[in-house]
Structures are given as C-alpha cells and as structure tokens.
C-alpha cells in the first residue's frame, strides 16, 4: 500500500512537470495502475492513458480483464499480440491495439539436431526456481543419458543455485543466450514462464510441471493436453513415450505464434 502511494505521487509530480499528451503504463492488474489512471484523468482529461499488457495472463487473473468505472479505465489498451487483444476486446469498450513485444521471435527451426536435452525455464520467483530445480535434479537421476539445461530468469541470482546443480553431472546452469539454448534443446519444462511461447515457436516440445492442490498457472490454459503434464519425476517416462509418436499439438503452436507480435512503433505514433 505504501509503495502504491509513493508511486502515485512520484508519477503525479512528473506529469505536472512534463505535461505529456500520452502516458503509457504497464497493465498487469495491480491496484496502483488504476490509481494512476484516476489521478491522470482528474489532473487533465486531455492526457491519453494507454495501458500496456506485456506479460503472460492466466485463467485465474480477473482484475486485468475487469472494467471499472470509466475514470479508472485506460483510454486505450495495448497488447503483446492477437491472443490477449481478443480477450480485452471481449471485456472492454475502449480501443485495443497490438503494440507487440520484444519477446517476439520469427518462427525458425534450428539446423542443429536436437537430442535428449531439456531446457528448464522457471519464473522470477525463488520458490518457483527452487521447485523446478528440485524436480530437474530428480528427473536427471532417473534419466542419466539425457542432459538438462537450467535457465534462471534474468531477475534471479543464479549463484544461489550453483551448489545444487553441481551435484548432478547431467544438469548445467545456462550462461548462454536463450536462442542458443533453444537451438540445442528438444524439450522445454515450464510452469508460468512466458519464455515457453518462444520455445514452442522454435520447435521445443512442452512439458508442464503440475503441482497437486495448487492453482494451475500454465500459460496455455485450456488448450494444453493433460498428457503433457508431469507431477512426479517418474511421469517423465510417459511424456517421452508420448512425444515419440506425437507431434506438438497444433493449437499450442498457433497459440505460441500469436501471443507475441513484432513491435509496431506506428501504433504509438498514431496516439500522439
């Protein structure tokens, strides 16, 4: 609450000094975002407020897709791609435009033959990183002929996990670019990370780590097949058997390719 109010007054001071025509703020469903919108509209109704959705959304997010009174709603919503544009259009009356995302990657297929390598992509939370790492180490023990590349989120300090990773010879901590990792891996193990869209677009086969009695945070939501979920380390064997005879679900590929679009700067110019 204190941080919300501090941000409120900091942005208020900047707006009074700069007097912008357009204010672009993040749109993740936080209370402070609505406070900023209300403040701007009270200060000067001629200032346009554009709210930009740039992160993954899940089935359990309500605040971001729930319109409030007009004074708390943005004048325009900018999205990362087609998927979220459609969802916002179903809920809001204001214009919704695709701005795109720096996470957008052109669809390509690596010429490097991908064999027996898993890419693990946790979110920027210690609990999620630790959970995925423990799962990875357990799976690595029962699949000694496979290699596992653990890629910490850029906001996490990977040093905290080096000692654990060093205990298992076939698990390595990534120090390469995400493109390098995507080019050499065949599978991607994930929970709520947006990087899974890039991975699937580059041909990696997705494996979701489900946790008993906890909310499902799979970014693919209802289109993801339960047959590609793992709960226990031993479940990895059924996944490998499944992918021996099955290709990635086409709905998953289409969803990945449409979640992030290329950045379109003309959208911003059109608002000025």
Task: Show where each model-derived region lies.
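Catalytic binding pocket for nucleotide-activated donors in carbohydrate/polymer assembly enzymes
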Residues: 92-98, 162-167, 194-259
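Conserved catalytic-core segment of nucleotide-activated headgroup transferases in glycan assembly
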Residues: 94-164
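Structural motif
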Residues: 21-24, 76, 117, 147, ...
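Active-site and donor-binding regions of nucleotide-sugar-utilizing enzymes
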Residues: 1-102, 196
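C-terminal alpha-helical cap of glycosyltransferases
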Residues: 258-272
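Acidic donor-binding loop of glycosyltransferase active sites
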Residues: 183-191
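Short, charged/polar "capping" segments at the starts of alpha-helices
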Residues: 32-33, 58-61, 84-88, 106-107, ...
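Active-site donor-binding acidic/aromatic loop of nucleotide-activated sugar
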Residues: 100, 169-176
